[in-house]
Amino acid sequence: MQKKKAYMVATSHIDTVWRWTIADTVEKFIPDTLSKNFDLIEKYPKYRFNFEGAYRYELIKEYYPKAFEQIKKYVRLQNWYPAGSEYENGDVNIPSPESISRNIMLGNNYFYDNFGIKSKDIFLPDCFGFGAQLPQIISDAGLIGFTTQKLSWGSAYGIPFDIGMWVAPNGKEIGASFNAKSYRYKLDGDVRGDLSVIDGIAKCASETNMKLPW
């Protein structure tokens, strides 16, 4: 029997459209995020980190060029993943499909120009509301995944599933994680032998016709 594995990948979200200033982002949040995750990568060679938003990378390149070169090294070593595909984590309710598509194009073009790779997902931890056509827009952009934690804050219809296939009205579909837990969620203890994680993923996948790699 093939051994089943689930991987945990760390992430950090710096909200550059929230109510603090760009100066706060540049002077406080970016260097703190970089230093902590650089230390973790050096201490744990198998540590993996997702960081989204091409705009944040632009700020790093402008204000912390040495750190930007270090990120390039970590990307080559597959410790660091430019994620989210978009240039900025914008609202996806009011903007037109073309606007969302251009946001993806700008973001992934930046990733390709600077790191030689493109992201395959949309990561929107802090946006409220996701239209039914979003899977079609994401799929047509050549992406395969979507993640949010915002539904844990509240939803008129609840959380449809934790992990599974999200299908647009026209039948286009993407893999989606709708319940990535809130920012304050803590996972305690050693979960390496916790089969409930695998079983939970398998159950959700079965209910939404999601193909798993086992």
Where are these regions (language model features)?
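Catalytic-domain carbohydrate-binding cleft regions of carbohydrate-active enzymes
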Residues: 1-214
